[in-house]
Amino acid sequence: MVQPSPAPVVTITPAPAPAAPSHPHGWKRKQEFKALHLALAFLTTLPLPHVRDVQPGDFARASAYYPLAGYAVGGLVAGLLYLNVPLPPGVVAALGVGLWLGLTGMLHFDGLVDSADALFAMKSPEQRLDILKDVHVGAFGLATGVLALLLLWSLLGAGLPWYAPLVAAVVARMVVLMPMNAYPAARQESLGAQSRQGRWGLAFLFALPALLLPHAWLAALVALLGVTLVAAWAARRLGGGLSGDVYGLLIVVAELLVLGFYGWGFTPL
């Protein structure tokens, strides 16, 4: 399995959550700030303090803030394109790929590779779930990972609007909540299972500024359609549920679809 950057240290405490204090509004603000912190620490490599005392339900609450992690990742890559660095387009695109992978700790890319090995295997759903836990990278994962990197590199070097990476990163982390909420968890003990049942409406509000950029709403529809189809196929291959690795796969698929939308000039409206 492709080794991502070390994940943030989180300790899930199964003990009951503490009772709300006498000032419920202040307590809720603290819980929401913790959810934001957890989302940024889990989905990015930003230099943030470790999240401590993670309670059951915190990951589900944090999923509403996934689009904000997209602003951090996509915004920095968009900044690289906006600066118009005096380097060949291929070099700038390679720097963009490296920055994208570095800011995510290769978390979603790792899920893409693991999912490809499992989903393309001619095995039973139970055996595919076992493959997801295998630490080795197979031919399907290697080929899919290389193809995804080539697509990302080609699209970033295709003269995209500078804001395209920002839209891609934000939209991908919004639309992934749809299959996360629609399908059961393939493995109940995983972090992916604990991230389900997120607040779609709040995530949409956070993504709204990005959706107001030129043609972003249409790109989001393309990404949502693609993610819906891939999620349905993956769920059938895994016996009806999805895993955290598949969530990573869906984020990468959505990002590439949005970048492809801008790269191929599908902006008629």
From Swiss-Prot:
InterPro entries: CobS
Xref: Pfam families: CobS
Enzyme superclass (EC): transferase
Pathway(s) of this molecule: Cofactor biosynthesis; adenosylcobalamin biosynthesis; adenosylcobalamin from cob(II)yrinate a,c-diamide: step 7/7
Compartments where found: Cell membrane
One function term, GO molecular function aspect: adenosylcobinamide-GDP ribazoletransferase activity
GO cellular component: plasma membrane
Domain of life of the native organism: Bacteria
Reported cofactor(s): Mg(2+)
Its EC number(s): 2.7.8.26
Lipid bilayer topology: Multi-pass membrane protein
GO biological process: cobalamin biosynthetic process
Catalyzed reactions per annotation: alpha-ribazole + adenosylcob(III)inamide-GDP = adenosylcob(III)alamin + GMP + H(+); alpha-ribazole 5'-phosphate + adenosylcob(III)inamide-GDP = adenosylcob(III)alamin 5'-phosphate + GMP + H(+)
Entry's transmembrane regions: 63-83, 87-107, 137-157, 158-178, 202-222, 246-266
Keywords: Cell membrane, Cobalamin biosynthesis, Magnesium, Membrane, Transferase, Transmembrane, Transmembrane helix
HAMAP family listed in its UniProt record: CobS (MF_00719)
Similarity-based family: Belongs to the CobS family.
Function description: Joins adenosylcobinamide-GDP and alpha-ribazole to generate adenosylcobalamin (Ado-cobalamin). Also synthesizes adenosylcobalamin 5'-phosphate from adenosylcobinamide-GDP and alpha-ribazole 5'-phosphate.
Protein name (record): Adenosylcobinamide-GDP ribazoletransferase
Native species: Deinococcus radiodurans (strain ATCC 13939 / DSM 20539 / JCM 16871 / CCUG 27074 / LMG 4051 / NBRC 15346 / NCIMB 9279 / VKM B-1422 / R1)
Taxonomic path: Bacteria, Thermotogati, Deinococcota, Deinococci, Deinococcales
